[in-house]
Amino acid sequence: STLMRSSAASDVYKRQIQAFMREKGLADSHALQAYFNRRLEAILEKYHRQMVGWDEIYHPDLPKSILIQSWQGQDALGEVVKQGYRGILSTGFYLDQPQYTAYHYRNEIVPQGLNGVDTISDNDSAQSWSFSMPRLKGSAVEGSFTLIKGEGGWRGFIDFKGKSRRAVQDIEWGGDDRLTFRVDTWMGETRPVLTVNDDKLGGYFLLGNTRYPVSGQRLEAVPQGTPPVVPEADQQKNLLGGEAALWAENVAAPVLDIKLWPRAFAVAERLWSAQDVNDSDNMYQRLQAMDSWSTVSVGLQQHTQQLVQFTRLANGGSTLPLQILAQALEPAHYYTRQHLKFQANHYHLFEPLNRLADALPAESTTVRNLDRWASRLISDAEDSESADALRHIFTLWQNNIADAQALTENSYQLAAIKPVVAQVDKLATLGIRLTDLVARQGTLDDKEYASVQAQLDEAAKTQDELVIAAVYPLEKLLRATKVE
């Protein structure tokens, strides 16, 4: 198993440890851990074994034969690699966190430079904004971002407190006061959706599928920032790859395969593939085939486990209404579920994993398809195939509502999702309306647009540890109806 740092349990032990440190001339707890690890490494070497430890074991007194496994990310890993140590990456490959598979697939094993993104010329115009994003557990995520308008359009970067600068992607402005962009972070795919008004900033950060409110203000100058730690070409040989991690707080044997598969296939391909193998659309096509093959020919249990959980939740009823309802849903991404359990004093190994959220895969294939069909229809209003596909799914959901509601009345474990069923019903009706509008290139006036957006904002809230992910393709359709 991987070594990790712990703390002493009592004052008695602390006094004994402090005396030992004075005797050995050890300045601090890090030096004490290095002393222990040096002795342990010698024992392991005697038996031809390799020491592997998390970032905390790194110490210049340890031999270069140790292997650092990084949870702290590319910066920490890049630093130890530059010092001549070998390392593997786990940040971005945490399968206990529900995340989009494309996020894992984009994960950078080799730390990337900025390639001039933060170089501001006299002909550029730049604006910088601070932000603070409170979390459900722990301190707020803080930092700043800078957007630069140049001859080639918009570019930008983000500076999270305590982390290196990262370039941002897909910058879009909606008028002069609304903006969004994307950046992959330790929290997952991070998409700020912001409104700026004079010198104030509001809105939310979308972490995967889950919204976290954010506030901030305009800065007078561009912050200095910390450049990313990028190893030289000859040092990159010390980056051996990565390892997926699956912590057990939200995992039990009956749902283990739901957590693992098929995302672990994409992580494996990321780790054994060249850096330029990064076509997410192609990956998803092959992932679907792997999902089917691994179920039928290998015997992996992700679909069987889901059906078993649905059977238990249905309490003697048909599981079909749950299967259809689940198409619109995903478990809340990032560590949202763990943090909600912490707030409710349920963050322990005795917490029963019996919610609908526990039976859901990290990502809804149906929602991803809805997003794809919406994009096609927006780019070509005469694409009747995409319009029909959208209407088919929304109609299927509408026709399922009565049966899904009946299940929530007959199962105490489903009682908490009664509001979810009602909202999916409204969203299905809205989906058909928006599809028809986009297909005929219709528009909504400002009042109607605001009303629909408010409905989507309400439906996007986390409920019983899950999210109605169908909100996001509907938002895409809604934006296509706005008169700019």
How should these model regions be labeled?
Residues 2-5, 9, 13:
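Single conserved hydrophobic/aromatic residue that forms the stacking wall/gate
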Residues 58-64, 71-123, 219-303, 375-379:
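Conserved alpha/beta catalytic core and glycan-binding cleft of carbohydrate-active enzymes
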Residues 127-218:
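Central antiparallel beta-sheet cores of small beta-barrel/beta-sandwich binding domains
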Residues 11-69, 74-79:
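Gly/Pro-rich turn-and-neighbor structural signature
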Residues 29-30, 38, 124-131:
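N-terminal-biased segments
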